[in-house]
Amino acid sequence: MTQEGQLEKRFLDYLHSERNYSEHTSTAYENDLSDFRRFLNEQAIIEYQQVTFLDVRIYLTELKQKSFSRTTVARKISSLRSFYTFLLRENVITENPFTYVSHAKNQLRLPKFFYSEEMEALFQVVYEDNETLTLRDRVILEVLYGTGIRVSECAGIMLSDLDTSYQAILIRGKGNKERYVPFGAYAEDAITDYLSGRIELMTRFKKTHDSLLINHYGDPLTTRGIRYCLTKIISKASLTRKIHPHMLRHTFATDLLNNGADMRTVQELLGHASLSSTQIYTHVTKEHLKSTYMKHHPRA
């Protein structure tokens, strides 16, 4: 491994062990470093210590010419700034060339959410029969919409994480932070109806694990597997616009705020470290109110 490769590995290990970053986040940093290393090779720059402010400006220009979104450019620069801050702390460099690099302010991108009639169409799909895998899909949909957890968090649910007496689930979120989220009667009924079929399927394939969600071989259902299940549900519901599974989380937050929930509670339920991450949903509700007004009021 080259010296530069060793520096990258030390940084990624630091993110994982000391900052408790998730594998998904660490992978994003690794990809950003890889892209920057490609750029440096093209510029015949061998060592990270050789990078100057001018080199950074050239790289920033290249990113913009490749039509990356402002959000992507901002993330890449943030990743590299963090990397060079780490190198500075480790006394590998004496000055961070990313310190004074600015980028265009991120555009406000409002989260997309499902409308009530779309949610009804999705639920119709998972309530059409009581086959074990349909019951599992029902659990996925009821839990994701009923709790607002991330798809990756849903994949990590163990039977031991379920507290049926309080109707709550122990969730391990980003940075391995734990939180309890409540779930309602629909999710509870879905889980209860599914568990006997889960046991039968696992017994058939001689599986012995604690994961709540399983695939057709009785193995734990992965994040990718849940996304695949949701994609099939969405397809069967014949929804016309372009949508994605994460919209269930957006819908959960939007529906809570539309029905009077306070911002701090929604923040806790979503597992957001910062209130600013939650406040984006107030823009969604305002836009929805305005759209409804403009569409239906005779003097709009």
UniProtKB/Swiss-Prot annotation:
Entry's Gene Ontology cellular component terms: cytoplasm
Keywords linked to the UniProt accession: Cell cycle, Cell division, Chromosome partition, Cytoplasm, DNA integration, DNA recombination, DNA-binding
Annotated Core-binding (CB) domain residues: 2-88
One GO term of the biological process aspect: cell division
The Tyr recombinase domain, residue ranges: 109-294
MF annotations from Gene Ontology: DNA binding; tyrosine-based site-specific recombinase activity
InterPro entries cross-referenced by the UniProt entry: CB, DNA_brk_join_enz, Integrase-like_cat_sf, Integrase_catalytic, Integrase_recombinase_N, Integrase_SAM-like_N, Recomb_XerC, Tyrosine_recombinase_XerC/XerD
Keyword Cell cycle: yes
Major subcellular site: cytoplasm
Subcellular localization, as worded in the UniProt entry: Cytoplasm
Active site: 150, 174, 246, 249, 272, 281 (o-(3'-phospho-dna)-tyrosine intermediate)
Highest taxon of the lineage: Bacteria
Role summary: Site-specific tyrosine recombinase, which acts by catalyzing the cutting and rejoining of the recombining DNA molecules. The XerC-XerD complex is essential to convert dimers of the bacterial chromosome into monomers to permit their segregation at cell division. It also contributes to the segregational stability of plasmids.
Similarity annotation: Belongs to the 'phage' integrase family. XerC subfamily.
Subunit structure comment from the entry: Forms a cyclic heterotetrameric complex composed of two molecules of XerC and two molecules of XerD.
Protein name: Tyrosine recombinase XerC
Organism of derivation: Listeria innocua serovar 6a (strain ATCC BAA-680 / CLIP 11262)
Organism classification: Bacteria, Bacillati, Bacillota, Bacilli, Bacillales
Gene: xerC
